[in-house]
């Protein structure tokens, strides 16, 4: 069972997964013009990005699927699945259309040497954008969450 903690409460502080900042890593050359491994990190954020934004804007939806309301746990579950990687219209943003009940979109922003999670939300149909790759979370996620079927 993964352990989630925070480095602090400021908007640029991080959620940690088992003591590390990376929730997943997109390997080098998976995306156009990205030649280095790119970790995916969840920052505390504010009203516009990160766990604070996700709780404020999508909290009711989140609690239906993550009853304790822990954004870090839910994001980790989503990043342990697979989906399409899309380039979105906004500069420096990447969309991951990930599938795990519920279907969702996870939006990343390129910060330079890592991707910061901007938001995650319910998205029944596909995102608008150019498909540039496939995200394979069960291979790339840090300590992948494995859904147990009953």
What are these regions (language model features)?
Residues 1-150:
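Ribonuclease/tRNase effector modules and their secretory precursors
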């Amino acid at each position: 069972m993964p352990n989630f903690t925070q480095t602090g409460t400021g908007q640029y502080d991080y959620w940690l997964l088992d003591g590390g900042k990376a929730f997943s890593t997109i390997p080098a050359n998976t995306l156009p013009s990205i030649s280095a491994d790119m970790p995916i990190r969840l920052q505390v954020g504010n009203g516009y990005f990160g766990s604070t934004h996700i709780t404020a804007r999508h909290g009711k939806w989140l609690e239906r699927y993550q009853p304790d309301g822990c954004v870090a746990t839910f994001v980790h579950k989503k990043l342990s699945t697979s989906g399409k990687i899309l380039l979105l219209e906004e500069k420096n943003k990447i969309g991951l259309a990930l599938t795990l009940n519920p279907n969702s979109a996870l939006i990343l922003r390129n910060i330079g040497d890592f991707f910061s999670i901007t938001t995650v939300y319910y998205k029944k149909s596909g995102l608008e954008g150019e498909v540039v790759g496939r995200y394979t979370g069960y291979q790339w996620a840090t300590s992948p969450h494995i859904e147990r079927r009953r």
